[in-house]
Swiss-Prot record:
This is Fluoride-specific ion channel FluC 2. One of its GO terms (biological process) is cellular detoxification of fluoride. InterPro entries: FluC. Belongs to the fluoride channel Fluc/FEX (TC 1.A.43) family. Na(+) is not transported, but it plays an essential structural role and its presence is essential for fluoride channel function. It catalyses: fluoride(in) = fluoride(out). The keyword Membrane applies. The chain crosses the membrane at residues 12-32, 41-61, 65-85, 96-116. One of its GO terms (molecular function) is fluoride channel activity. GO terms for cellular component: plasma membrane. It comes from Parasynechococcus marenigrum (strain WH8102). The lineage of its organism: Bacteria, Bacillati, Cyanobacteriota, Cyanophyceae, Synechococcales. It is a multi-pass membrane protein.
Amino acid sequence: MAEQFSMLRSELTELLLVAVGAVPGALLRWQLAHHLGDQNLLVNVLGAALLGLLAGRPVAPRRQLLVGIGFCGSLTTFSSWMLAAMKHVSAGDWPAALGLIGLTLGLGLGAAALGFSLGRRLRPPEQPRSEP
């Protein structure tokens, strides 16, 4: 019974971390859309850079849940990106659809790589191991 309670407590803590991280990510996305208009490209590239940064350095699992899954997951948008591409396809504008997909993939991959590289540079130096 105690083990089940401990497992449930751990899962609820993880769920709470994701939810707490998701709120500011969603609010930032909403504010960017409110002030700058449709900014799927901006939020997806920004989210990719931040995830790359997290991946490039040692991050505690709880921070990964809070920032990686919660914040970045709610900031970025795959479905809105695909809907924008589909609207171009529906209008018969395949070049615009493919351009949007290619641009987002290219910039997103570049941003993730840049974030990863920066994360590696910001990584704390490895501590020398003392041998017994």
